[in-house]
């Protein structure tokens, strides 16, 4: 199927595009996500009840969810509603050991420093930050990658990119493969978080990151 790209301001807003893709399929696809940090919160911790299976079919229900959800609660909502089957979430910030749903898999490199080092001693972290889209890094990060001909979503929160050089790894075969074979790519600008988390001296913005990735073919 033809690849689609959706660019939003905030991560939870990707739910709209995920639900639209689900309507075209007879099954829920898996999603592979890259994010600085994932909250893994249950979608119903606020005033919103958990969705019923199949809630993705009603546009008003999805729109209400987007208005109500915050942070990364959309993962739990999408799993409970049957929009996606699994979520493989690669992060570089501190890991959450407990997730809101058993099909939500948060993964982080074992040798990564904690957020205290990333934020307080960023130059020590720069060599790793520059490799976070490299083929070797992504292959080691995810417990599994999409199978050949698998229909899936590639989801990138732009605050995962902490420096401009990260967008240009020497070996970009795997990220390009993930981009080219995805049924849907969702990009969250998250400009405020990119501004907070980017390494010193970097001028990259979430809008720029999303624009660059959206041109990859």
Per-range role (PLM):
Residues 31-41:
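Long, hydrophobic, well-ordered secondary-structure blocks that form the structural core
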């Amino acid at each position: 199927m033809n690849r689609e790209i959706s660019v939003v301001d905030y991560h939870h807003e990707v739910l709209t595009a995920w639900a639209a893709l689900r309507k075209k399929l007879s099954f829920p696809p898996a999603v592979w996500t890259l994010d600085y940090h994932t909250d893994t919160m249950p979608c119903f911790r606020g005033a919103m009840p958990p969705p019923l299976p199949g809630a993705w079919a009603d546009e008003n229900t999805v729109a209400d969810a987007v208005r109500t959800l915050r942070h990364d609660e959309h993962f739990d909502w999408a799993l409970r509603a049957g929009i996606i089957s699994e979520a493989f979430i690669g992060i570089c910030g501190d890991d959450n050991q407990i997730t809101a749903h058993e099909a939500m898999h948060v993964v982080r490199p074992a040798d990564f420093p904690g957020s205290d080092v990333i934020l307080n001693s960023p130059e020590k972290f720069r060599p790793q930050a520059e490799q976070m889209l490299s083929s070797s890094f992504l292959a080691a990060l995810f417990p599994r990658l999409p199978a050949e001909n698998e229909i899936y979503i590639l989801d990138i929160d732009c605050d995962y990119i902490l420096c401009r050089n990260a967008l240009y790894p020497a070996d970009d075969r795997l990220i390009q493969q993930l981009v080219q074979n995805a049924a849907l790519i969702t990009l969250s600008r998250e400009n405020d978080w990119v501004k907070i988390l980017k390494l010193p001296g970097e001028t990259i913005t979430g809008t720029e990151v999303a624009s660059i990735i959206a041109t990859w073919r």
